[in-house]
Amino acid sequence: MRLILLGAPGAGKGTQAGFICQRYGIPQISTGDMLRAAVKAGTPLGLQAKAVMDSGSLVSDDIIIHLVKERIAQPDCAQGFLFDGFPRTIAQADALKAAGVRLDYVLEIDVPFEAIIERMSGRRSHPASGRTYHVRFNPPKIDGKDDLTGEALLQREDDKEETVRKRLQVYSAQTRPLVDYYSHWARVEPAAAPRYRCISGTGRVDEITARALQALAC
C-alpha cells in the first residue's frame, strides 16, 4: 500500500495516518522527518540539505525527491508507505511523477473549513498537566478553568482563529490544487495514475477510520 494522504490542517490527517499505517504495516513518511534523519546520518544528501537550511534557504524539490527515493528504498517500505504532508505543491507532484515513484492511492480527508476553524479554535489546554478541552465538544465544568486545579486554561497560538484562517489560506493556494491534479490524472490515465479517493472527515474518529479503510479497499 503506497499512498498520499491529503487534507487541510486540522482535518485529522495525523490521527488517520496512524490507523492506516497500523492496518497495513507501513511507515508514515514526512519530509521533515526525512530531512532530520539525513542530516543526523551525515549522508551526502543530508549534508547538502543542511548547507541549504543553514543558509536560511528552502531545500530544493530536487533534493527532496532524491531523499524520498532513498527513504522508500529502505526495508521498512517493502510493503508500502504513507506520505504525510508531501507532496505539498504541484511542482513536487510533477517531480514525484517524473521520478517514477509508484503510488496506489491518493486519499483526501475532506472537512469544511468552517468546521476546521471551530474544531481548532475551540481547543483549550492546561499546560501543567497536559489535560485538553474543547469549548464545545469537551468543555470544562467551569468555563476557562481546569476541572481538577481550577487554574486558567490556555489557547495555543496555532489554534487562534486568525492563525487557523491564515493556514487554511496557504493550504488553499499551495496544496489544495493537488486534489485537482490527482483526481484529473486518475480520470485521464487510470492505468498509470494512483486511484483517487475522497472521504468525509466529519464525525467520530472510528467512523472516519472505517471510511478511510473502506476507500482503500476498493
From Swiss-Prot:
Its EC number is 2.7.4.3. Gene3D superfamilies: P-loop containing nucleotide triphosphate hydrolases. GO terms for biological process: AMP salvage. It catalyses: AMP + ATP = 2 ADP. One of its GO terms (cellular component) is cytoplasm. AMP binds at T31, R36, S57, L58, V59, G85, F86, P87, R88, Q92, R156, R167. It is an enzyme of class 2 (transferase). Pfam families: ADK, ADK_lid. It is found in: Cytoplasm. The keyword Ribonucleoprotein does not apply. ATP binds at G10, A11, G12, K13, G14, T15, R123, T132, Y133, G203. Consists of three domains, a large central CORE domain and two small peripheral domains, NMPbind and LID, which undergo movements during catalysis. The LID domain closes over the site of phosphoryl transfer upon ATP binding. Assembling and dissambling the active center during each catalytic cycle provides an effective means to prevent ATP hydrolysis. Monomer. Belongs to the adenylate kinase family. Catalyzes the reversible transfer of the terminal phosphate group between ATP and AMP. Plays an important role in cellular energy homeostasis and in adenine nucleotide metabolism. This is Adenylate kinase. The gene is adk.
